Curated annotation (Swiss-Prot):
Gene Ontology biological-process entries: phosphocreatine biosynthetic process
Name assigned to this protein: Arginine kinase Oct f 2
UniProt family annotation: Belongs to the ATP:guanido phosphotransferase family.
Annotated residues for binding of substrate: 56-60, 217, 263, 305
Keyword terms, alphabetized: Allergen, ATP-binding, Kinase, Nucleotide-binding, Transferase
The enzyme's E.C. designation: 2.7.3.3
GO CC field: extracellular space
SUPFAM superfamilies: Glutamine synthetase/guanido kinase (SSF55931), Guanido kinase N-terminal domain (SSF48034)
Segments forming domain Phosphagen kinase N-terminal: 1-83
Record's catalysed reaction(s): L-arginine + ATP = N(omega)-phospho-L-arginine + ADP + H(+)
Matches recorded under InterPro entries: ATP-guanido_PTrfase, ATP-guanido_PTrfase_AS, ATP-guanido_PTrfase_cat, ATP-guanido_PTrfase_N, ATP-guanido_PTrfase_N_sf, Gln_synth/guanido_kin_cat_dom
Comment on activity versus temperature: Relatively stable below 30 degrees Celsius, but aggregates above 40 degrees Celsius. Flocculent precipitate appears by incubation at 70 degrees Celsius for 30 minutes.
Length: 348
């Protein structure tokens, strides 16, 4: 299987993925027969990237142990993607939540439509989608939901499994853009949708400012969000949820990598802090992308990666996930968004 996949990759002349760049014949021969303690193989890691030659990264981790067993290729991809000289990540640090110096980025309410911060988390005792069986997913859902149901205060809420979700709830959550689906072909090829929709679901707080996706791409995606630009409130809520969940669950992490995720692009802080912001003038300027790059920001359409902007509204987020702390990541995003607002205001 691995041999066939590697041959397909080598023959894909239009493929420019990081997998193709870094999985040399020498590395392939060295790694192809190895197995992780979860039973993961090199074939499990590279299947999606070989079947989808237009992949950007092209490699997933079959499980937390893959980052050790297949380090020779994964480390090379990680350094290239995260633009770092060596695989290194600091100890997690969310800052002093009582003294963050992060507030409302848009007090006027004229530009920022909404603010969202999310992290991914993986159970350390379960593999990632390529090695998971149906029973694993069900068990993981059970322990995740048990922890979620212990949340209190503004984080208290309800869990809705996808497997027996009513049409009304499904319609409402889709309209709210809260629901995830099984339409990503890269994830599909990586076994991300095996046994769909069993073992998957969504938890949200009563006022829907805190959500958790269970067994979407990662085991857990913790999401804090609200209308307007108060990044401080959104971030503080997320940190509170993370701290409470960490008391109940053991998450996969590695000293030099931070928190482990299915895709190596999300490693480290796993944090994506974003705003939906109206920038009709700045977005038309030829230097828009270079301004984003200067402040380590990523701009994309409001419906996710590879989508277009609607009415000059863009999703602006931090680009760097690895090699910096959570607090550094969110403050870097804050400084960048402040500059974006300044540039938009000064554009004619």
């Amino acid at each position: 299987m691995a041999e066939e996949l590697f041959k397909t990759l080598q023959n894909a002349k239009e493929c420019h993925s990081l997998l193709k760049k870094h999985l040399t014949k020498e590395r392939f021969d060295k790694l192809k027969g190895l197995k992780t303690k979860f039973g993961g193989t090199l074939a499990d890691c590279i299947r999606s990237g070989c079947k989808n030659p237009d992949s950007g990264v092209g490699i997933y981790a079959s499980d937390p142990d893959a980052y050790t067993v297949f380090a020779e290729v994964l480390d090379a991809v990680i350094m290239d993607y995260h633009k770092i000289d060596k695989v290194h990540h600091p100890i997690p640090d969310f800052g002093d939540v009582n003294n963050l110096n992060i507030g409302d980025l848009d007090p006027s309410g004229n530009m920022i439509v909404s603010t969202r911060v999310r992290v991914g988390r993986s159970h350390d005792s379960f593999g990632f989608p390529p090695v998971l069986k149906k029973d694993d997913r069900i068990k993981m859902e059970q322990v995740s939901v048990e922890a979620l149901k212990s949340l209190d205060g503004e984080l208290a809420g309800s869990y809705f499994p996808l497997a027996n979700m009513s049409a009304d709830v499904q319609k409402q959550l889709t309209e709210d853009h809260f629901l995830f689906n099984d339409s990503d072909r890269f994830l599909k090829a990586a076994s991300g949708y095996d046994d769909w929709p069993i073992g998957r679901g969504i938890y949200f707080s009563e006022n829907k400012t805190f959500l958790c996706w269970v067994n979407e791409e990662d085991h857990l995606r913790l999401i804090s969000m609200q209308k307007g630009g108060n990044l401080g409130e959104v971030y503080k809520r997320l940190v509170s949820a993370i701290n409470k969940m960490e008391k109940k669950l053991n998450f996969a992490k590695k000293d030099n990598m931070g928190y482990l995720t299915f895709c190596p692009s999300n490693l480290g802080t796993t944090m994506r802090a974003s705003v939906h912001i109206k920038i009709p003038k700045l977005s038309q300027r030829s230097d828009f992308k270079s301004i984003c790059d200067k402040y380590n920001l990523q701009a994309r359409g409001i419906h996710g990666e590879h989508t277009e902007s609607v009415c000059g509204v863009y999703d602006i987020s931090n680009k760097r996930r690895m090699g910096l702390t959570e607090y550094e990541a969110v403050t870097e995003m804050m400084r960048g968004v402040n500059e974006i607002i300044r540039e938009e205001t000064n554009s004619t």
